[in-house]
């Protein structure tokens, strides 16, 4: 008799995705981040659910309801900080996951790559709206500044912003709808992640060499289940160190001041994981130009497969491309630093140079480097 695992309609799906899945024998720890992102998502949904049981999405009580969660709810403080820092861990995993895809040429699976880009946008939208919910100073002003960017869209901009706000400023209606969207989006992300995985399993995983590995596959369980569990334990260790030792390390002190529309904080800045995009936005003096650059800084990922000029898929054996890749990483770290600095000299100039370098690397230098490498190998 065949094992129920292989015959039952539901068990069969799980079996083919997590147990008997043929996986390349040489995938490194950089392939752990998919499962870690799944772990983060489940953690965020669970902690978020428990927070939603005690949170009130009303401008008069939102701030105090978060304080109530931290002070009066049993283990409310740990749930709140796991949720806040869980978002940071989520984005660390996301950036590493995307970076892995760029380095090893995983973008050559277009469906998987494109659903991944949609997932990235959905996650960024969710995180932004979540940051507004505690209704501190940075929540309020962050929401005001970022939503106001849409007013740069010609003709419909102003109407669009007022439609999103539900009034003439960020107020009760805005907070209520942001809470509703923040609650529903993770479930949409979960559905998109399932589609992402479905597309991945159509082609099978890529591997560090970028060479098809059909001739050398091993079962996912036990080899990669144990590897994923180790990854999850390390993720949990990092998260709990953040939560228990320095829960406010990545937050903004201004968010411990209740939202006040009459008092603007000296430096309005988003959470650390948006700073690179914020720096690109600020480096262009024109409002519409800045908004376009902001969107394109992420949307540029969609044309990466079209810019692939190399005869090899992975960067593993391409030293010139490797140098440019790590230059891109350094550039993104520079942009992240600049995004957190006030908009004054010399930070403005550094931000502009880093923004130019970011787009130049992806659109011009990396494709040229690939062509040079092809010629060096006489291909």
From Swiss-Prot:
Recorded GO CC terms: mitochondrial inner membrane; respiratory chain complex III
SUPFAM superfamilies from the UniProt entry: a domain/subunit of cytochrome bc1 complex (Ubiquinol-cytochrome c reductase), Transmembrane di-heme cytochromes
Positions annotated to bind a ubiquinone: 201
Entry binding sites for heme b b562: 83, 182
Major localization class: mitochondrion
Cofactor entry: heme b
Subcellular location field: Mitochondrion inner membrane
UniProtKB keywords: Electron transport, Heme, Iron, Membrane, Metal-binding, Mitochondrion, Mitochondrion inner membrane, Respiratory chain, Transmembrane, Transmembrane helix, Transport, Ubiquinone
Cofactor note: Binds 2 heme b groups non-covalently.
Gene Ontology terms: biological process: mitochondrial electron transport, ubiquinol to cytochrome c
Record family assignment: Belongs to the cytochrome b family.
Function: Component of the ubiquinol-cytochrome c reductase complex (complex III or cytochrome b-c1 complex) that is part of the mitochondrial respiratory chain. The b-c1 complex mediates electron transfer from ubiquinol to cytochrome c. Contributes to the generation of a proton gradient across the mitochondrial membrane that is then used for ATP synthesis.
Subunit organization: The cytochrome bc1 complex contains 11 subunits: 3 respiratory subunits (MT-CYB, CYC1 and UQCRFS1), 2 core proteins (UQCRC1 and UQCRC2) and 6 low-molecular weight proteins (UQCRH/QCR6, UQCRB/QCR7, UQCRQ/QCR8, UQCR10/QCR9, UQCR11/QCR10 and a cleavage product of UQCRFS1). This cytochrome bc1 complex then forms a dimer.
Protein name from the UniProt record: Cytochrome b
Organism: Lutra lutra (European river otter)
Species lineage: Eukaryota, Metazoa, Chordata, Craniata, Vertebrata
């Amino acid at each position: 008799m065949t094992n129920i695992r292989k015959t039952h309609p539901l068990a069969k799906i799980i079996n083919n995705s997590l147990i008997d899945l043929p996986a390349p024998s040489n995938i490194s720890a950089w392939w752990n981040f998919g499962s870690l992102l799944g772990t983060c998502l489940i953690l965020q949904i669970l902690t978020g659910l428990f927070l939603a049981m005690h949170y009130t999405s009303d401008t008069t009580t939102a701030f105090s309801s978060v304080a109530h969660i931290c002070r009066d709810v049993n283990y409310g403080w740990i749930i709140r900080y796991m949720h806040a820092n869980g978002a940071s861990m989520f984005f660390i995993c996301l950036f590493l996951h995307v970076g892995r895809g760029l380095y090893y040429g995983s973008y050559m699976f277009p469906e998987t790559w494109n659903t991944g880009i949609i997932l990235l946008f959905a996650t960024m939208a969710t995180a932004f709206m979540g940051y507004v919910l505690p209704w501190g100073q940075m929540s309020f002003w962050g929401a005001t500044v970022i939503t106001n960017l849409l007013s740069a869209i010609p003709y419909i901009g102003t109407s669009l912003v007022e439609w999103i706000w539900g009034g003439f400023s960020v107020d009760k209606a805005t907070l209520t709808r942001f809470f509703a969207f923040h609650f529903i989006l993770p479930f949409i992300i979960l559905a998109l992640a399932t589609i992402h995985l479905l597309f991945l399993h159509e082609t099978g995983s890529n591997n560090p060499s970028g060479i098809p590995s059909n001739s050398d596959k091993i079962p996912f369980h036990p080899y990669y289940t144990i590897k994923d569990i180790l990854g999850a334990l390390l993720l949990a260790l990092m998260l709990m160190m953040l939560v228990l030792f320095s829960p406010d390390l990545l937050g903004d002190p201004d968010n411990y001041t209740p939202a006040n529309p009459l008092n603007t904080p000296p430096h309005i800045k988003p959470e650390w994981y948006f700073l690179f995009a914020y720096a690109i936005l600020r480096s262009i003096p024109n409002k519409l130009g800045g908004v376009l650059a902001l969107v394109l800084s992420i949307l540029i990922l969609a044309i990466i497969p079209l810019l692939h000029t190399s005869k090899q898929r992975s960067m593993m054996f391409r030293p010139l491309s490797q140098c440019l890749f790590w230059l891109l990483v350094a550039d993104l770290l520079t942009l992240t630093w600049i995004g957190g600095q006030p908009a004054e000299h010399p930070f403005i100039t550094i931000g502009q140079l880093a923004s130019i370098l970011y787009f130049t690397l992806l659109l011009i230098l990396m494709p040229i480097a690939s062509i040079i490498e092809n010629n060096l190998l006489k291909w």
